UniProtKB/Swiss-Prot annotation:
Organism classification: Bacteria, Pseudomonadati, Pseudomonadota, Betaproteobacteria, Burkholderiales
Organism superkingdom: Bacteria
Family annotation (SUPFAM superfamilies): LexA/Signal peptidase, Winged helix' DNA-binding domain
GO biological process: DNA repair; DNA replication; negative regulation of DNA-templated transcription; proteolysis; SOS response
Enzyme Commission number: 3.4.21.88
Transmembrane segments: none
Enzyme class at the top of the EC tree: hydrolase
Site positions per UniProt: Cleavage: A101, G102
Protein name: LexA repressor
Family per record: Belongs to the peptidase S24 family.
Catalysed reaction equations from the record: Hydrolysis of Ala-|-Gly bond in repressor LexA
Alphabetized GO MF terms: DNA binding; serine-type endopeptidase activity
Active-site feature positions: S136 (for autocatalytic cleavage activity), K173 (for autocatalytic cleavage activity)
């Protein structure tokens, strides 16, 4: 296992804990703010050093494109991983493919298959996996083909990444409530945000993202 400097270990721990608590890695700016760096570029240099030591993987062009490659103790599993994964505590989760208009997201016809995943990688137990389509959440480290682990919920706090139903479509976005309206925020400047007026549009929350499984390996 690579030997990390004390600062590198602190940054690795921040990445791991942020993924564990929110389901997603921190941005360079968030790392810089946490450690008092003068700019995100300083955080980037530390991340590159961690990548060279083989403990993380960086996704070019994504502000949250950080993936843990190793655990730092025998009792830990990586917070983001590729299937299949062996473990003592296993969850069997349905993988939701395309969702037909007007039908429940977990309707039998939407289930592509069942996956077994290690329960220890999630602080909150997910109810299902949703295959991500497109790159609208790229800068949150969520890429086309990834599997998003989702806990069923009809309400969510501001700032959470959610699965939302808007009319006939199901989308993954960051939730923000403003002045009686709801904004579904894309994490990619190439995609527009979506404004929703409750009561005027068919809108519902289907769940909150609690983790991510990379598409590589299956």
């Amino acid at each position: 296992m690579a030997t990390l400097t004390p600062r590198q270990q602190q940054i690795f721990d921040l990445i791991r804990n942020t993924i564990r608590n929110t389901g997603f890695p921190p941005t360079r700016a968030e790392i810089a703010a946490e450690f008092g760096f003068s700019s995100p570029n300083a955080a980037e240099e530390h991340l590159r050093a961690l990548a060279r030591k083989g403990v993380i993987e960086l996704t070019p062009g994504a502000s949250r494109g950080i993936r843990l490659k190793v655990a730092r103790s025998d009792s830990e599993m990586p917070d983001q991983f590729s299937l299949p994964v062996s473990g003592i505590m296993q969850l069997t989760l349905p993988l939701v493919g395309r969702v037909a208009a007007g039908s429940p997201i977990l309707a039998a016809e939407h289930i592509d298959r069942q996956y077994q995943v290690d329960a220890s990688v999630f602080d909150e137990r997910p109810d299902y996996l949703l295959r991500v389509r497109g790159l609208s959440m790229r800068d949150a480290g969520i890429l086309d083909g990834d599997l998003l682990a989702v806990r069923k919920a009809s309400e969510a706090p501001n700032g959470k990444i959610v699965v939302a139903r808007l009319g006939d479509d199901v989308t993954v976005k960051r939730l923000q409530r403003r002045d009686g309206a709801i904004e579904l925020i894309a994490e990619n400047p190439d995609f527009p945000n979506i404004m929703v007026t409750p009561g005027r549009e068919e809108f519902s929350l289907e769940g909150i993202a609690v983790g991510l499984i990379r598409s590589s390996g299956f």
